[in-house]
């Protein structure tokens, strides 16, 4: 017999969604500000109501049953609609609203001041938390710890960072595409040489450790040509590579996105940018689509929709 929703405590559905996100009774309890015992009791009630285990224990935490997997999208949509309904009376000035962002630097630093002003104009009591994009950021979006991410992906067919490789639960929108440049100080000796692949490879390079990898599409293209660059230094962020490349008497070359020109102008670094010495087909493999990323469950969340549109508008005004 079909059960009526009137026989179910709807608070249990929130517990169910958090269990699906966290795959842990303890972590779900922490987010609900209750004890793990209370979450376990709620899970027992849900199992009885759905007549299904819903989750089973595994070495990686709670593993959802086929029924739970089939309900995930419907549950997320139901929660979105509930949030929309509850948001109505407070849509203009909600208290305690938090914006959790993950972005690579200096991508967010370029517009952080303008974005924060927009947020505080609309939500005066909001708080903003910005973290650097790293190997765990996609999982953080899935876990609900990050509202929206802003990061570059890759276009090389052999890359692990293709847009097509994103998890199915992640939605995205490409804001702009960029091709990296070579950044070197204004008095670098390479500027007095013919700029070609041999010159590019003659000098030591700064590499960015990206999502736990020291190599990226640039190294794939060089490998296809039977060439290799000398990586003398690995750093976690683009702005650090620009800072080091700008140091006096430094022979290091930094390869970073073209948008860093804006960052370079803001901080008046003594750097010039040269194109990577590749043909058009090779340049195409190095194209970086800079992308907003969010979880599908937040596709209609008013806060996330507003944030996406605000970031899009800010970058359009800089183009």
Swiss-Prot record:
Keywords: DNA-binding, Transcription, Transcription regulation. GO terms for molecular function: DNA binding; DNA-binding transcription factor activity. Involved in anaerobic NO protection. Belongs to the LysR transcriptional regulatory family. InterPro entries: LysR-type_TF, LysR_subst-bd, Tscrpt_reg_HTH_LysR, Tscrpt_reg_YidZ, WH-like_DNA-bd_sf, WH_DNA-bd_sf, YidZ_PBP2. Residues 25-44 bind DNA. Residues 8-65 form the HTH lysR-type domain. This is HTH-type transcriptional regulator YidZ.
């Amino acid at each position: 017999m079909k059960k009526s929703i009137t026989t179910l405590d709807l608070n249990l559905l929130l517990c169910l969604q958090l269990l699906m996100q966290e795959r842990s009774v303890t972590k779900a309890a922490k987010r609900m500000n209750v004890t793990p015992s209370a979450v376990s009791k709620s899970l027992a009630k849900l199992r009885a109501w759905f007549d299904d285990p819903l989750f089973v224990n595994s070495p990686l935490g709670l593993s959802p049953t086929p029924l739970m997997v089939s309900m995930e999208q419907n549950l997320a949509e139901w929660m979105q609609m509930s949030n929309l309904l509850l948001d109505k009376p407070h849509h203009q000035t909600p208290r305690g609203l938090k914006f959790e962002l993950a972005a690579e630097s200096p991508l967010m630093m370029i517009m952080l001041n303008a974005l924060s002003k927009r947020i505080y104009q609309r939500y005066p009591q909001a708080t903003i938390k910005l973290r650097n994009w790293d190997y765990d950021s996609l999982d953080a979006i899935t876990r609900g710890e990050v509202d929206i991410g802003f990061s570059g992906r890759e276009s090389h067919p052999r890359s692990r960072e293709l847009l097509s490789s994103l998890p199915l639960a992640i939605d995205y929108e490409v804001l702009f595409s960029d091709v990296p440049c070579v950044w070197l100080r204004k008095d670098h000796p390479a500027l007095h040489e013919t700029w070609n692949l041999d010159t590019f490879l003659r000098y030591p390079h700064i590499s960015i450790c990206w999502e736990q990898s020291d190599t990226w599409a640039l190294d794939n293209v060089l490998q296809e040509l039977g060439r290799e660059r000398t990586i003398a230094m690995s750093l976690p962020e683009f702005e650090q590579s620009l800072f080091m490349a700008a140091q006096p008497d430094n022979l290091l070359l930094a390869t970073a996105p073209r948008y860093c020109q804006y960052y370079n102008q803001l901080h008046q670094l003594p750097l010039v940018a040269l194109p990577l010495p590749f043909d058009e087909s090779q340049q195409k493999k190095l194209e970086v689509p800079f992308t907003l990323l969010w979880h599908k469950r937040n596709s209609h969340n008013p806060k996330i929709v507003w944030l996406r549109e605000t970031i899009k508008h800010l970058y359009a005004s800089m183009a």
